[in-house]
Amino acid sequence: MGIIFYTTQMPNFEQNQVIAVGLSGGVDSSVAALVLKEKGYEVIGLFMQNWETDSKDPFCTAEQDLSDAKAIADHIGIPLYVVNFSKAYWNHVFQHCLDEFAQGRTPNPDVWCNREIKFKSLLDHAKKLGATHLATGHYACIQNENNEYRLLKSNDSHKDQSYFLHLLNQYQLANSVFPIGGYQKSEVRAIAKKRGFINHAKKDSTGICFIGERKFKDFLNEFLLAQPGNIETSEGKIIGKHDGIMFYTVGQRKGLHIGGRPDAGEAPWYVVDKDVKRNVLIVVQGYEHPLLYSQELTCTNLHWIRDTEPSFPLTCKAKTRCRQADQTCVVTRLDNDHCHVQFEHPQRAITRGQSVVFYLGNECLGGGIIN
């Protein structure tokens, strides 16, 4: 099976150009490297080490990932360099996440890692090695319109990762390429299997990258001091104790340990809010409880991908989590760094600290942090 090249999603590079690929050991970046290699480009692989781990840590996959990346690089016939960004990751991603958790918010480290590490530190390193562009295995597309770069959704709507890339700027997009943005995930796996890649069936990484498969609560306890407190209903009735509000997020059901109360119905309880000042976790009963829904939000730390921001009020689509269907909304500018977002329909479990990302059709416009 030959590779179908989606040339509309690939810049017209000179074939003697050097393109660096962030090779993670996963199937997506492996096929991205293969696509570039078979199009005739000079390809080099870069494997990032963003977290200092004990090699005996049963939850860390970095050792296996590096082994897989080396095997793929050898298979394709490209050099592989290992680069350590653990200090930069700690300072620009992990510490930010700790600060957010400590303030009762729920951060998204993948968003910050893309802006600060993959498309900054790794891109800079690729340039030092003589590469003109950095390629990754992200499911997204870049389009150049008269030297203004647009971030577009992937052809695979189920795997689209534009949500996680909304903080990228014009320089980062101009110097990046997403070789598999035009593919379906099933096509990527089929190519990898046909070419004999050892990772063709490797499962996708999920969850927070630096936690891996370990329990979230156990990991966070290593870095932040938990303060147990009360769990209250929305009416103010104390019905239990929590282990620390940093361990919970809006919409969460599991881990509350307050079910089966004789003074309540059988419907499950859900986190609806976190009162950081009082160290109180507020819950409601029932998945469809009206307090779990909101038709508006405000956001800060606004970033627009194009150099010229859109006109306001802006009618567009938005997501408040990555796998959510696009939601119609109107965005109104409040000041230089704040916007108000009014949705057409109520949205469930809008969460402080997460990103709200805006779209016009297939284009990702940018976004902000929900507060």
UniProtKB/Swiss-Prot annotation:
ATP binds at residues 22-29, 48, 137. The record marks 138, 354 as: Interaction with tRNA. Its EC number is 2.8.1.13. Residues 159-161 are annotated as: Interaction with tRNA. Keywords: ATP-binding, Cytoplasm, Disulfide bond, Nucleotide-binding, RNA-binding, Transferase, tRNA processing, tRNA-binding. It is found in: Cytoplasm. SUPFAM superfamilies: Adenine nucleotide alpha hydrolases-like. It catalyses: S-sulfanyl-L-cysteinyl-[protein] + uridine(34) in tRNA + AH2 + ATP = 2-thiouridine(34) in tRNA + L-cysteinyl-[protein] + A + AMP + diphosphate + H(+). Disulfide bonds join 113-209. The keyword Protein transport does not apply. GO terms for cellular component: cytoplasm. One of its GO terms (biological process) is tRNA wobble position uridine thiolation. GO terms for molecular function: ATP binding; tRNA binding; tRNA-uridine 2-sulfurtransferase activity. Pfam families: tRNA_Me_trans, tRNA_Me_trans_C, tRNA_Me_trans_M. The active site is at residues 113, 209. InterPro entries: MnmA-like (IPR004506), MnmA-like_C (IPR046885), MnmA-like_central (IPR046884), MnmA-like_central_sf (IPR023382), Rossmann-like_a/b/a_fold (IPR014729). Catalyzes the 2-thiolation of uridine at the wobble position (U34) of tRNA, leading to the formation of s(2)U34. Belongs to the MnmA/TRMU family. HAMAP family: tRNA_thiouridyl_MnmA (MF_00144). This is tRNA-specific 2-thiouridylase MnmA. The gene is mnmA.
